[in-house]
């Protein structure tokens, strides 16, 4: 890695530590040329493949923005949204693939959002699953009730 101070093409790792709950590695480096130290943070790249075929980096902020829209007017705070985004990223990373289709990100959002707020879940699901009629909502509400029955009894 190039030194950011003198642009020397090599550096030595002095210390490495996990950070961001194991999602990144913080490395302290030393330049053999100028002797200055600097820090780098390394993360595994996770890319989302959109329907159009375009690939873009996974963004927790984009997850939060989409879910926040569904939660508009609901009693959902920023901490809950941040936790949901972390759960979604963890689920997507758990697939082990460096690239995931955008529909898998949407699926990963649905479960935690259902547990967080049912109304927000229905709003998000209606857009994600392209509801076209009240019957689509009715089917989803029935599935939601069935899920509640299973979680209460189990």
UniProtKB/Swiss-Prot annotation:
PROSITE patterns cross-referenced by the UniProt entry: ATP_CONE
Residue span(s) of domain ATP-cone: 46-136
Entry superkingdom: Bacteria
Cofactor dependence: Zn(2+)
MF GO annotations: ATP binding; DNA binding; zinc ion binding
The entry's keywords: ATP-binding, DNA-binding, Metal-binding, Nucleotide-binding, Repressor, Transcription, Transcription regulation, Zinc, Zinc-finger
Pfam families from the UniProt entry: ATP-cone (PF03477), Zn_ribbon_NrdR (PF22811)
Cofactor note: Binds 1 zinc ion.
GO biological process terms held by the UniProt record: negative regulation of DNA-templated transcription
ZnF region ranges: unnamed: 3-34
Function text: Negatively regulates transcription of bacterial ribonucleotide reductase nrd genes and operons by binding to NrdR-boxes.
Family note: Belongs to the NrdR family.
The protein's name in its UniProt record: Transcriptional repressor NrdR
Highest classification ranks of the organism: Bacteria, Bacillati, Actinomycetota, Actinomycetes, Mycobacteriales
Gene: nrdR
């Amino acid at each position: 890695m190039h030194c950011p101070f003198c642009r020397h093409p090599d550096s030595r790792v002095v210390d490495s530590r996990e950070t961001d709950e194991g999602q990144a590695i913080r490395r302290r480096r030393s330049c053999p040329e100028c002797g200055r130290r600097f820090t780098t943070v390394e993360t595994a790249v996770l890319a989302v493949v959109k329907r159009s075929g375009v690939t873009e980096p996974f963004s927790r902020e984009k997850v939060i923005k989409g879910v926040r829209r569904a939660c508009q007017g609901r009693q959902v705070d920023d901490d809950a949204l941040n936790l949901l985004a972390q759960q979604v990223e963890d689920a997507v990373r758990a697939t082990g693939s460096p690239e995931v289709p955008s529909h898998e990100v949407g699926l990963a959002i649905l479960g935690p959002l259902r547990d967080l707020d049912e109304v927000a879940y229905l709003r998000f699901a209606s857009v994600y699953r392209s509801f076209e009629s009240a019957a689509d909502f009715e089917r989803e509400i029935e599935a939601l009730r069935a899920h509640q029955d299973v979680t209460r009894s189990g």
